[in-house]
C-alpha cells in the first residue's frame, strides 16, 4: 500500500507520542519519576506533538497541493497532451527544480515529436510528388518508342540515335530512383568520383534528348560560351542531373514557342564556371525565390496552379549542388522570365 505524505506525517507523530509515552511509563515503573511528573510529561508530550502536527499540516498542505498539480501535469503529458504548461512552482526549492527539469524534458520531447511528424509529412508528400521527376524521362521513352513502333523514325542513324536516347533516359530513371532513395533515407553517404569534363560535349549529351521536344514546341534554344573553357575536373553525374533538372524547370514554366538561353562563362581567376539557364517564363515573386529549393515547397504556389508538379526537381538539384562543390542562384522577374545559375568550382585533384 502506498501512503500519502500526510498519512506518513500523522503516523510519524503518533509513533513519536506512543514511543515517548512508553518511555515515560517505563520510567514511572522504575520510579524514576513520581506519578504527577509522569502525567505532566505525558500530557506535555501529547500537546506538543499535536501542535507539531498542526504546524506541519499548515506548511505541508501547500506542498501536497503542488505535488498533486504536478502529478496532473505529468499525466496529461503522458496522455499525449504536449501543449505548453506555464504553471510555475517557485517553492520549495526541490519542487521548483523538479518542475524546471520536467519542463525542459517536455520541451525537448515536444520538439522531437514535432520534428518526427514534420519528417513523416515531408516523406509522404515526397512520395506523392515522385511523378514530377518521372515525367520527362518517361515522356521521352514513350515518344521515341512510339516513333520506332509506328515507323516515323526510319533512317539508320536516327534509329541508332533513338536507341541511345532510350538507354540514356532509362539510365536517368535508374539514377532518379537512386536519388529518391537517398532523399527518403536522408543521408546515405553516396559520393561521386571526379571526372575530366569537356563542357561543350557534356551539354551536347544533356541537350540531345530534348531535341525532338524543342522542335515540336517550336522553341529556340541557344548555348553561348562567353569565353573558351578548357577541360576541368568536376563530379559529372550530379552535374548532369543538376543541369537536366534546371532545364526541365525552364521548359515546364515557359510557353511553347519561347526562347531558352544557356550562357557559360569562366571567371578571371579561372577557378569557377557559371552556367546560366534563362527562360521567358512566368517568373517567381521575390519572397518565394529562396523557398523554391525546399523539399516540400510546391511550385504552383509561386508560379501557376495549372502547371502542377512540385519543387522536388529543384530541391534535388540544390542538394546535389551543395554536396558536390557547386551552388545554384536564382533571379526572376514576373512575366519576364527566370535565370537559374549554377556556379561550379573546379576541382584540384592534385590536392
Swiss-Prot record:
UniProt cross-references to Gene3D superfamilies, sorted A to Z: 1.10.287.130, 6.10.340.10, Histidine kinase-like ATPase, C-terminal domain
SMART domains, A to Z: HATPase_c, HisKA
Upregulation: Transcription is affected by Agr and SarA. Also, transcriptionally repressed by NaCL, pH below 6, glucose and the antibiotic clindamycin.
Localization: Cell membrane
Transmembrane segments: 9-29, 40-60
GO biological process: osmosensory signaling via phosphorelay pathway
Top EC group: transferase
Domain Histidine kinase: 129-348
Alphabetized InterPro entries for the sequence: 2-comp_sensor_kinase (IPR050351), HAMP_dom (IPR003660), HATPase_C_sf (IPR036890), His_kinase_dom (IPR005467), HisK_dim/P_dom (IPR003661), HisK_dim/P_sf (IPR036097), Sig_transdc_His_kin-like_C (IPR004358)
Reaction catalysis annotation: ATP + protein L-histidine = ADP + protein N-phospho-L-histidine
A molecular function (GO) term: ATP binding
Membrane topology: Multi-pass membrane protein
Residue stretches making up the HAMP domain: 61-114
Post-translational modification: Autophosphorylated.
Any one cellular-component term (Gene Ontology): plasma membrane
Modified residues (Phosphohistidine): 132
Keywords: ATP-binding, Cell membrane, Kinase, Membrane, Nucleotide-binding, Phosphoprotein, Transferase, Transmembrane, Transmembrane helix, Two-component regulatory system, Virulence
Recorded superkingdom: Bacteria
Listed EC numbers: 2.7.13.3
Coiled coil residues, start to end: none
Function: Member of the two-component regulatory system SaeR/SaeS involved in the regulation of staphylococcal virulence factors in a strain-dependent fashion. Probably functions as a membrane-associated protein kinase that upon sensing the appropriate signal, autophosphorylates and in turn activates the cytosolic response regulator SaeR. SaeR/SaeS activates the expression of exoproteins involved in adhesion and invasion of host cells, including hemolysins (hla, hlb), coa, Dnase, spa and cell wall-associated proteins (emp, eap, fnbA).
UniProt-recorded name of the protein: Histidine protein kinase SaeS
The organism of origin for this protein: Staphylococcus aureus (strain NCTC 8325 / PS 47)
Gene that specifies this protein: saeS
Amino acid at each position: 500500500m502506498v501512503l500519502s505524505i500526510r498519512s506518513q506525517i500523522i503516523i510519524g507523530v503518533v509513533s513519536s507520542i506512543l514511543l515517548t509515552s512508553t518511555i515515560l511509563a517505563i520510567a514511572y515503573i522504575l520510579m524514576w519519576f513520581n506519578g504527577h511528573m509522569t502525567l505532566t510529561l505525558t500530557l506535555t508530550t501529547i500537546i506538543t506533538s499535536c501542535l507539531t502536527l498542526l504546524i506541519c499540516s499548515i506548511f505541508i498542505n501547500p506542498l501536497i497541493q503542488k505535488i498533486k498539480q504536478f502529478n496532473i501535469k505529468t499525466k496529461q503529458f503522458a496522455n499525449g497532451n504536449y501543449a505548453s504548461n506555464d504553471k510555475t512552482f517557485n517553492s520549495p526549492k526541490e519542487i521548483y527544480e523538479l518542475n524546471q527539469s520536467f519542463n525542459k524534458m517536455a520541451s525537448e520531447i515536444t520538439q522531437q515529436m514535432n520534428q518526427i511528424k514534420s519528417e513523416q509529412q515531408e516523406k509522404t508528400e515526397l512520395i506523392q510528388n515522385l511523378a514530377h521527376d518521372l515525367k520527362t524521362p518517361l515522356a521521352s521513352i514513350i515518344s521515341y518508342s512510339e516513333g520506332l513502333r509506328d515507323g516515323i523514325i526510319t533512317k539508320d542513324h536516327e534509329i541508332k540515335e533513338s536507341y541511345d536516347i532510350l538507354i540514356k533516359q532509362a539510365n536517368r530513371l535508374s539514377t532518379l530512383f537512386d536519388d529518391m532513395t537517398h532523399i527518403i533515407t536522408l543521408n546515405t553517404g553516396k559520393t561521386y568520383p571526379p571526372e575530366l569534363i569537356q563542357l561543350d560535349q557534356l551539354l551536347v549529351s544533356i541537350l540531345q534528348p530534348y531535341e525532338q521536344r524543342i522542335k515540336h514546341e517550336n522553341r529556340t534554344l541557344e548555348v553561348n560560351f562567353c569565353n573558351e573553357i578548357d577541360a576541368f575536373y568536376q563530379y559529372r553525374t550530379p552535374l548532369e542531373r543538376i543541369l537536366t533538372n534546371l532545364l526541365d524547370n525552364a521548359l515546364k514554366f515557359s510557353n511553347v514557342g519561347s526562347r531558352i538561353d544557356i550562357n557559360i562563362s569562366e571567371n578571371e581567376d579561372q577557378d569557377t564556371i557559371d552556367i546560366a539557364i534563362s527562360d521567358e517564363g512566368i517568373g517567381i515573386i521575390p519572397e518565394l525565390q529562396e523557398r523554391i529549393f525546399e523539399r516540400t515547397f510546391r511550385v504552383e504556389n509561386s508560379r501557376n496552379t495549372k502547371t502542377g508538379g512540385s519543387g522536388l526537381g529543384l530541391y534535388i538539384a540544390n542538394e546535389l549542388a551543395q554536396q558536390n562543390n557547386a551552388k545554384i542562384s536564382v533571379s526572376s522577374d514576373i512575366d519576364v522570365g527566370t535565370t537559374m545559375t549554377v556556379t561550379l568550382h573546379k576541382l584540384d585533384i592534385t590536392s
